[in-house]
Design a protein with these regions (language model features):
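Short alpha-helix in the alpha/beta-hydrolase fold that links the catalytic acid
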Residues: 16, 30-41, 65
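C-terminal catalytic histidine-bearing segment of alpha/beta-hydrolase fold enzymes
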Residues: 47-115
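Short beta-strand/loop motif that positions the catalytic acidic residue
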Residues: 14, 20-22, 26
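Primarily recognizes the serine-hydrolase "nucleophile elbow" in alpha/beta-hydrolase
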Residues: 1-16
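Acidic catalytic loop of the alpha/beta-hydrolase fold
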Residues: 25-29, 58-59
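Short helix-capping segments at alpha-helix termini
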Residues: 42-46
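Secondary-structure boundary/capping motif
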Residues: 10, 29-30
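Alpha/beta-hydrolase-fold catalytic nucleophile elbow
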Residues: 1-4, 21, 53-54
Length: 115
């Protein structure tokens, strides 16, 4: 999982399932870069889910930035709604991906037991 990553230099050949969580108004690691990454990698590599939180800035899940502030020239600000929704998104993403792994393991174990 990647909270507000820098997608500008990211490879389009991701090898593991990934969820990207980013704020629409992030001026440090812009969501537009992640949207371009998704366009570049369409159909390549492991599945990637991009979630953009409307009105949210960089560090939207860091409660210490409740009032917002400038950090290294960028605006960081907590957004309780985006933070809560991101936890649910990560939970659902991990549950889905781990269920896929569990299914593959069950299939492998069953085939091993038949040999």
């Amino acid at each position: 999982m990647a909270y507000y990553p820098s997608c500008s230099g990211a490879t389009d050949q991701l090898t593991i399932p990934t969820i990207i969580l980013i704020g629409e108004l992030d001026d440090w690691t812009p969501a537009k870069d992640c949207e371009r990454l998704m366009e570049r990698r369409a159909g390549k590599g492991a599945p990637v889910k991009l979630v953009i939180y409307p009105g949210a800035h960089h560090a939207f899940n860091v409660a210490a930035f409740r009032d917002g502030m400038r950090s290294f020239g960028h605006w960081v600000k907590y957004d309780a709604d985006a933070a809560q929704r991101s936890v649910l998104e990560v939970h659902d993403f991990l549950a889905t991906e781990l269920a896929k792994i569990e299914d593959r393991l069950k299939t492998n174990v069953a085939s091993w037991q038949q040999t």
